[in-house]
């Protein structure tokens, strides 16, 4: 399976085309050769209106690509704060792990995405989950981010 018209429109940020395709019955959870759904691309490229349309029409917020990454992994790594909020509002799993054992919080910490990391923790992201390298998000965090997150959790 390759890219569907919905994948292309979502990736390109074409709101009206996405809306029309959904209205015509396009499969919102279609996967391409990388295991990605249109929502993976909307999340990655910070296409907020498109993500909302997809989610409101049944897109799975926890869809996994071939690396077991979800749209939330992508948004957290890219530093798309509003997208992280949108996905969390639509019940994206906050402690879901990719093929390397990383949670979205690991990726946010690794990329120094302070606000995204704080938002994930405030929604229940664990600072204690170890990835395959036995690193927690706190060990991956750079600068003072680890201390900030630890204070949030431990008070």
Language-model-detected regions and their locations in the chain:
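Conserved ankyrin/ankyrin-like repeat signature
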Residues: 16-17, 49-50, 82-83, 115-116, ...
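Ankyrin-repeat-protein effector appendages
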Residues: 57, 90, 122-155
């Amino acid at each position: 399976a390759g890219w569907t018209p919905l994948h292309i429109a979502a990736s390109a940020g074409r709101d009206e085309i996405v809306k029309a395709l959904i209205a015509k019955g396009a499969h919102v959870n279609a996967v391409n050769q990388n295991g990605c759904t249109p929502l993976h691309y909307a999340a990655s490229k910070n296409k907020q209106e498109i993500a909302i349309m997809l989610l409101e029409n049944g897109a799975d917020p926890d869809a996994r690509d071939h690396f077991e990454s979800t749209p939330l992994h992508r948004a957290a790594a890219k530093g798309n704060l509003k997208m992280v909020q949108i996905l969390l509002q639509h019940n994206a799993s906050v402690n879901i792990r990719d093929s390397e054992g990383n949670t979205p919080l690991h990726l946010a910490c690794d990329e120094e995405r302070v606000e995204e990391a704080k938002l994930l923790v405030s929604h229940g992201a664990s600072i204690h989950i170890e990835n395959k390298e036995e690193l927690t998000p706190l060990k991956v965090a750079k600068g003072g981010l680890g201390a900030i997150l630890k204070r949030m959790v431990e008070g």
